[in-house]
Amino acid sequence: MSSEGGGKSAPQIPDGLIEELSVELQGEDAPFASSMERDLELKWSEEGESRLGFTRFECDHNEIYRRRRLGVPPGPVTIALNPILKDDTALFRHTLAHELLHAAGLLDHDDLHARIVSKVAPAPKLRDSPVLMRLREQVLEGLPEGQWICGKCGHTWERRRVTRPARCPKCASRFEAK
């Protein structure tokens, strides 16, 4: 595995993560798993990147599916992780496991992909993740309305969540926005 830092140290794969993923991938259709570490470059993405991580193969998607079908190694693979993950070990591990599965040949976000990631590196709870809390605050700040108003009783309360509440906390009627 190579890594280029450009002045900042490149991310490192936590001890045992590749081995845990390899165990879970036994018997599954993951044609690049055996060559995953050989041509893998791990780096930090650019500041301001909106994604937590991404996997990039050097060849186009048609060639990747052809190589997957033929069982041929994919060639050089780059996994870029968002630098904000430096502050959150659990989310870093979860995101890296997700991207390593793509590098192993699980290209789709299906049930198998989700099951393996949640078993090997479960996503942290919102309250346990400083990065997720920060991202949640950014989303809430960007919403046009800062409060909810019940259409039935007129009760007003501060908006702390992105999704619409099911019921008014005062009158308990089904929530209808005013």
What are these model-predicted stretches?
Residues 5-90, 107-178:
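Metalloprotease/metallohydrolase-associated module, dominated by Zn2+-dependent proteases
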Residues 94-106:
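Active-site recognition of the HExxH zinc-binding catalytic motif
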